[in-house]
Amino acid sequence: MRKTQPKKIPLAPDPKFNDRLVTRFVNNLMWAGKKSGAYIIFYDALDKVAKITGESGYDIWKKALTNITPGVEVRSRRIGGATFQIPAEVRADRKVSLSIKWMVKYSRDRNGRSMADKLANEIVAASKGEGASYKKKEDTHRMAEANKAFAHFRI
């Protein structure tokens, strides 16, 4: 194990919304180092979201991310030969990372023509409290609730 925590690399805000969270999302969306392509997909998806909902695509995306952000998760801990799933609160930076990764993963898994279409549909679904990424958050919370009896163990 390393002795010190590595320094966080400061991210540059994105050109359109001047938001570091957008850059973080685009970095996860990026495929094979093609960042400009990832930005095009993201902005295109937000335009499609705005067209579908009639509201700002950026605001809907923020709401969708908030909706799929997990509060608790289960972590495995081996105690006396048995492995227990112990519920634990999720750190703030991990919350954001998980929600971004889930949205990108389940957007890729969707059926659709282009990645922008699939991402737009997942954003709209997540903002309404539907979709695969929202279901993942609910499943995570359900697992933590089911294993509440082991919450007294330390992680």
Regions found by a protein language model. Give the residues of each.
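Strongly charged
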Residues: 1-32, 36-39, 43-155
